[in-house]
């Protein structure tokens, strides 16, 4: 403690002392003083700041106590998405992952990986500007999270100010908030003493504590933060490796898990995995596996991402926990697509940190395969957040009165017929929108964050709206009045007004999200986006023939049929028309993709027709390619086919034209192909020239600094629409660097390499030239 009589110097000295002790305790795992001494100095600082309020600083340790409760959390758009990871469940899958890495990098050398325990907590993003913590956010759906800055400031292992003078201008840190076992036990003891509900496991306790609207509650909870990556770095030289990045985070005062190691090759990874697995029960926090990441950042950039996960990382999951219990009964749930799912009602049992009383049985085939009966003693499996499932029965313990399990003959909800094709695993209710459960689940899906993202419209409110018969379809949501909503239980005028405002805000939505929200069978986010990108507008998708749908990336035969069947159903068409009439406006380019139109050749149409059942058996793709290039139109092909054998182009075997003539005459295939051809011609007339639609093809762009009019993720998507590859670091292959406010080391490197640099205004001008609004992405 300082003896200086200047209060400001005293306060600064006390803050420095406490921050240094916190760094020694949390980062170096080397406590410098007993807790009692820390508490004495903390009280001295608190007393001094109370005497001189002007001396309180944002990074003072006394400011971790929490603030007045919030009404709700603000939404935060992640500039760099917080992605999930692919999983490996055994050694073979890990070897396969390593093989994919080396093949994609085209290297034969052994790869260095960073191996780290996979903490079972809540993923969090911390944003520092000029060393000060300015924002903390939850992962959310990876694109949008919640602003938890006030709560994060109460966590002792979260630095309010980065350590040292040489800190980045802008740093986004990713990590995990966990609750240690000892703290969890103490918290539950307090809950029990107060007559409150106990937490099932440390993960639930951590998540519930971090998402408290009253940060004073968060401050009272024993939470800890471990940093594991950085998403943004400006004003500081980017480290060359992941391990060097972790060293930098430690130097700046962030806590990094002490178990993390650099491993040379897969065998070293497996040794690390086994070591952590053996150490697992002795750790003071929950882990559910190990994460492996390619150490070199340049290799990470080269490997890139697939869908919602990086190619350069994988989670090696631990074996799941299993327990025995008794199957008391089976209920059948109906999902939004009508699928019937059997749910096991179990004698409650403690599995993997939670009490399990329900578990999935998957489907009737699985029940029969496992010969599971009501009354059986069964094995229940649970891994992390995976829904518990019954994996087998113990016939030797089967009671004499055990009952078999049969598929219901009619829907347990609406009484409609249950249909199941001879080759179908899933049985479905045919009730459609008259089935209350299907209607209910379809509306919940429509409102969900990854779909229309209607803030405040949660599952319980949807249940209430359906139960009160205020809505029967998703279009009815946009006909709701505030007074109708305000009359519901636990809803008031303010909540009702907020919901109506959220519904209004959701009307402008990307076409891909809109298609996903409709809940078309087998259509996920990626397929919905591909449909939007290929066709360019909703009307074209609604009227697209199966022959064209099959040409869309990732659309197979069953998916194409599902899309066609959905838009052919009059009830679905009425719902879509109702949404449009209420002002819902799906946003897209308005024109088909030039690359997609170019792919719709006569040969492609013939291949699609073959998959749909046109009798082209024995005619291979090579022959179809020759026919498609030799004849310009379906009419020309039909005329040649009518000539029969001998009219085949070179490279096509004799007899094909005779077979083709017969096939074209069956089931109106000639007319169907000609209709598709006309659609293609119309799309070609509306599509931009290919070079105009992909003006940045083959170029690598880099984004740096803060963009003001849209996020970096939106800018990235917009550039990708123009054909550019967006990289995370500057190299000699970079074509352009977009520099926003506070651009740092990337800008400096670009200037040193003589790479062209543009600002946000120039980027926006380029995007406007090509009709792209990044704010709508």
From Swiss-Prot:
The active site is at residue 118. It catalyses: NAD(+) + (deoxyribonucleotide)n-3'-hydroxyl + 5'-phospho-(deoxyribonucleotide)m = (deoxyribonucleotide)n+m + AMP + beta-nicotinamide D-nucleotide. The keyword Manganese applies. NAD(+) binds at residues 35-39, 84-85, 116, 139, 176, 293, 317. Zn(2+) binds at residues 411, 414, 429, 435. GO terms for biological process: DNA repair; DNA replication. Its EC number is 6.5.1.2. Residues 691-777 form the BRCT domain. Its cofactor is Mg(2+); Mn(2+). InterPro entries: BRCT_dom, BRCT_dom_sf, DisA/LigA_HHH, DNA_ligase, DNA_ligase_AS, DNA_ligase_CS, DNAligase_adenylation, DNAligase_N. One of its GO terms (cellular component) is cytosol. It comes from the Bacteria. Keywords: DNA damage, DNA repair, DNA replication, Ligase, Magnesium, Manganese, Metal-binding, NAD, Zinc. It holds the Pfam family BRCT. DNA ligase that catalyzes the formation of phosphodiester linkages between 5'-phosphoryl and 3'-hydroxyl groups in double-stranded DNA using NAD as a coenzyme and as the energy source for the reaction. It is essential for DNA replication and repair of damaged DNA. Belongs to the NAD-dependent DNA ligase family. LigA subfamily. This is DNA ligase. It comes from Alcanivorax borkumensis (strain ATCC 700651 / DSM 11573 / NCIMB 13689 / SK2).
